C-alpha cells in the first residue's frame, strides 16, 4: 500500500475504509442468521457457530499477520484482505437469501458525527491523561466536548421517529446484558492481546510469526467451544453460560499472570482457558442480543452488538493500555539520571535508546525496563481478570427470566 502511495493520510484513509466495510458486513451476517433460522434451538446453535468463527477469525489475525511479516513486505497485511474478500463474495452470493430491507430509513449523518466526535473526545482525554506529561486542560476540554456530543446523540436518538439506535431495546434486560457482556469480554481480550504480544516480542524475543503461533490456542479454543455454547444456551440459559464463560476467562487471565515466567505448558493452558471463556461469552451474548428482539429490529440489534465489540476493543486498548503505560513509567528505575525521559514512555522506546548507549549502561537499562514492563504486564492481566470476575458476579445476581429454561433435573433411575 505504501509503495502505491507513500502517505500516512492514504494509509489512515484505507484503514477507515476497512472499518466501514466491516461495520456494514458484520451486522448483516448476524441478521441473516436471525432471519434464516426460525427454531430457537437451531438459531442458538447457528449463532454459536457464527460467534466461534467471528472470534476465531479475530484472534487469528495476529497469526496471519505474523506469517506475512516474517516472509513478505509489511503492506501485505492489508493486501491479503483483497483475495479473501473476493473469494468470500463469490461463495456467499449464491447462498445468501434475499431479505427485504427498510429502504426508506434515512441515514442520520448528524447523529453519526455526534457519536464519532463524542467517542474520539472521550478516548483522547483518557489517552492524554495517561501520558508522561499530560496537558490537563486539553484533556478536560476533550472529555467535556466528547460527553456533550454523546449527550446530544442520545437526546437526538430518543426524539427521532426512526433512530439509528432505538434505546427502547435496552429496556429488555436480557438484551442489555448481552450487549454489556460482549463489550466487557472484548475489552479484556483486546487489552490482554495488547500487552501479551509486546511481552512475547520485546521481552521473550519471539519473532512476529512465533508470537502469533503462541497465541493460537485462543482462537482454536474459541472455535471449538462456540457451537457447544450455542447448544447449551437453550438448555441451561444465557445467564449460566455467560457467567461460567466469564469465570473461565478470568481464570485464564489470572493463570497467565501467575505463569508468564513458568513453563510454556502452563501459559498455553491459560490461553486455552481464556479462549474457552471468550468463545462461550461471545456466543451467549450474541444469543441474548438476537433472540430478544423481533425480526424487524434484528438488523439494528446486530449493529448494536457489533458496536459493542468495536467499542470494547477501543476501551480495552485505551484503559488497559493507559494502565500499562502508567505502571511501566512508575516502576522503571533508571540506571542513569542523564537518560532521556522518553525511556519511561514504553519498553520499545527504552530498547531504542539502549541501542545508542555504552554496553554496560544499555544492558542495565534493558534489564530494568523489562522488569518494569513485567510489572505493567501483570497489572493489566489482573485488572482484566478482575473485570471479568466482577462481570460474572453481576450476571449471577440477575434473576433468571421466566422464559429462560430451568436447569435439567438430576437423572434418577
What are these regions (language model features)?
Residues 60-69, 122, 229, 316, ...:
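Small-residue (Gly/Pro/Ala) motifs that create kinks and tight helix-helix packing interfaces
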Residues 1-110, 137:
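Helix-loop-helix hairpins in multi-pass membrane proteins, especially solute transporters
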Residues 19, 47-58, 62, 111, ...:
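Structural signature of transmembrane alpha-helices in multi-pass secondary transporters
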Residues 48, 70-182, 188, 206, ...:
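Hydrophobic transmembrane-helix bundles of small-molecule transporters
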Residues 10, 135-145, 149, 158-333, ...:
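12-transmembrane solute porter fold
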Residues 20, 82-89, 150, 250-251, ...:
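Small-residue-rich packing faces within the transmembrane alpha-helices of Major Facilitator Superfamily
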Residues 287, 352-413:
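Transmembrane-helix exit segments and adjacent C-terminal regions of multi-pass membrane proteins
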